[in-house]
Swiss-Prot record:
GO CC terms in record: cytoplasm
Pfam families documented for this protein: RecX_HTH2 (PF02631), RecX_HTH3 (PF21981)
Cell compartment(s), UniProt: Cytoplasm
Protein name (record): Regulatory protein RecX
Function field: Modulates RecA activity.
Source organism (scientific name): Acidithiobacillus ferridurans
Keywords: Cytoplasm
Keyword tRNA processing: no
Length: 90
């Protein structure tokens, strides 16, 4: 029950694991959750469909997702770090 509640609230796997440990529950069951899709939905709800406009905006979104408990790899994939981003104003 705690698991479903936290996922509905938009928390990621790291936060979920921490909450389960605090409650004294072992997180041995593998959750069938697409964390990338979950992170994209949380980011879209908070920031809309627009991609980060500059390095400051990128960092703000990354901090938000990290605070929600998503992994660094998931955050980079959601924010498009795989694509070449040039935030410098030439």
């Amino acid at each position: 029950m705690l698991t479903r509640t936290r996922v509905r609230q938009g928390h990621g796997p790291l936060r979920l694991r921490q909450d389960l440990q605090r409650a004294g529950v072992e997180a041995t069951a593998a959750l069938e959750i697409d964390w990338l899709q979950q992170a994209q939905a949380v980011c879209q709800k908070r920031f809309g469909d627009t991609p980060p406009t500059d390095a400051r905006d990128y960092a703000r979104r990354a901090r938000f997702l990290a605070g929600r408990g998503f992994t660094g790899e998931t955050i980079r994939r959601v924010l498009g770090a795989g694509r070449e981003r040039d935030f410098s104003a030439d």
